Amino acid sequence: MTDSTNVSNTENLMKYMSLDQRGSVMAEYIWIDAHGGTRSKTKTLSKAPSSVDELPEWNFDGSSTAQAPGDNSDVYLRPVAMYPDPFRRGDNILVLCETWDSDGSPNKFNYRHDCARLMETHAKEEFWFGLEQEYTLLGPDGWPYGWPKGGFPGAQGPYYCGVGTGKVYCRDIVEAHYRACLYAGVKISGINAEVMPSQWEYQVGPCHGIEMGDHLWISRFLLHRVAEEFGVKISFDPKPIKGDWNGAGLHTNVSTTSTRAEGGIKAIESYMKKLEARHVEHIAVYGEGNEERLTGRHETGNIDKFSYGVADRGGSIRIPRQVAKDGKGYFEDRRPASNADPYQITGIIAETLCGGL
């Protein structure tokens, strides 16, 4: 897909990937940095752990990730979830970690900690989430992959769920990522090409409570790693190309015990009032650069105004027509940007609907 110096030499690599590890296990410790990206490093274990509780804490140089000052740079990694590693396979694992400071407090960029507490506090509500992660594929020059150099493809229209040359780009990456997620046990539920060429979407969920953020972050890590092997960049910018092009979001589907019960549409209506009252607070944690995307055009609501409706993709919240017909189900929060943190999204939704800690 690009110059060979930027991609993996798979044929050469496979000679080494098949070597016997002699009982050792490679554990890829993954964490979220200060900029909403993923970082990782590998630790050798003497045997395969049977649960995440058997994994040791580790640490990293937080001054190199903007998570700690240079004179007190150690940040600790506490494993919270583990998954089969689709790249190394065998007994090797991916380890999702929370970040903690040396004084025993969660790092200020550890949004998972408070989210997990909220989900535990409101466990009786049985929050189910489903996230729709949109992203854009970029070439090494930072321009959307497959677009004319310095130019633009034809207008939007034929690309959404498109099939065929000139309508979709980099399907190999999308398919590889799908398989990697399934192998790792990520609850990926589908994929599709999006409205803007070189933009794609995958869906994760339904997931229960804190599991939503965990699975979404691992899926992002896997996407970056897969694209790395093809020499292609992944952008979660909510408006990567200015002008008459769709932005990228992280639409968030939400249900609770109350909304799924008979007559649950009444609970959904009551939630709308609560969400409207805290619209500004939600926008504050729904991603950077979201003002470029939430303009009231290109299937978005206006960032300054809360609105909702049945089957309305131009509102802040969409209530699916089938939900309105059934009188129960879920709603879709269309405000979050593609680069938003899923822990912050799901956490503030739980807080707004059910109360804080």
From Swiss-Prot:
Enzyme class: ligase
Main location: cytoplasm
Domain (GS beta-grasp): residue spans on this chain: 25-104
EC code(s) of this entry: 6.3.1.2
MF term (GO), any: glutamine synthetase activity
Keywords from the named record: ATP-binding, Cytoplasm, Ligase, Nucleotide-binding
Compartments in which it is found: Cytoplasm
Similarity remark: Belongs to the glutamine synthetase family.
Protein name per its UniProtKB record: Glutamine synthetase
Species: Emericella nidulans (strain FGSC A4 / ATCC 38163 / CBS 112.46 / NRRL 194 / M139)
Organism phylogeny: Eukaryota, Fungi, Dikarya, Ascomycota, Pezizomycotina
